[in-house]
Each structure stands twice: as structure tokens, then as C-alpha cells.
């Protein structure tokens, strides 16, 4: 059952990376909330 472990590790790594990028980028999108103009 090594394939299952490897798949789980791969999915976990991709998930963490995707989560990090997803949480890192959005803050730049909601600019209208600041209303600096």
C-alpha cells in the first residue's frame, strides 16, 4: 500500500502549496474595501 501513502503525501503537499498561494494573493484583490482614494 505504498502507492496510497505516496498519493496522500503528494495531495497534501499540493494542497498546502495551493492554500498558501490562495491565502497570499486574495488580500491584493479586495482593494475597494480600503477606499484609499
Curated annotation (Swiss-Prot):
Entries under SUPFAM superfamilies matching the protein: Photosystem II reaction center protein T, PsbT
Subcellular location: Plastid, Chloroplast thylakoid membrane
A GO CC term assigned to this protein in UniProt: photosystem II reaction center
Origin superkingdom: Eukaryota
Transmembrane segments annotated in the record for this chain: 3-23
UniProt topology in membrane: Single-pass membrane protein
UniProt-listed Pfam families: PsbT
Coiled-coil parts of chain: none
Alphabetical UniProt keywords: Chloroplast, Membrane, Photosynthesis, Photosystem II, Plastid, Thylakoid, Transmembrane, Transmembrane helix
Keyword Acyltransferase: no
Main localization, broad class: plastid
GO biological process: photosynthesis
Keyword Isomerase: no
Cited InterPro entries: PSII_PsbT, PSII_PsbT_sf
Subunit: PSII is composed of 1 copy each of membrane proteins PsbA, PsbB, PsbC, PsbD, PsbE, PsbF, PsbH, PsbI, PsbJ, PsbK, PsbL, PsbM, PsbT, PsbY, PsbZ, Psb30/Ycf12, at least 3 peripheral proteins of the oxygen-evolving complex and a large number of cofactors. It forms dimeric complexes.
Similarity comment: Belongs to the PsbT family.
Function: Found at the monomer-monomer interface of the photosystem II (PS II) dimer, plays a role in assembly and dimerization of PSII. PSII is a light-driven water plastoquinone oxidoreductase, using light energy to abstract electrons from H(2)O, generating a proton gradient subsequently used for ATP formation.
Protein name as annotated: Photosystem II reaction center protein T
Amino acid at each position: 500500500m505504498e502507492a496510497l501513502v505516496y498519493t496522500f503525501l503528494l495531495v497534501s503537499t499540493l494542497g498546502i502549496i495551493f492554500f498558501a498561494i490562495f491565502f497570499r494573493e486574495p488580500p491584493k484583490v479586495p482593494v475597494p474595501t480600503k477606499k484609499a482614494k
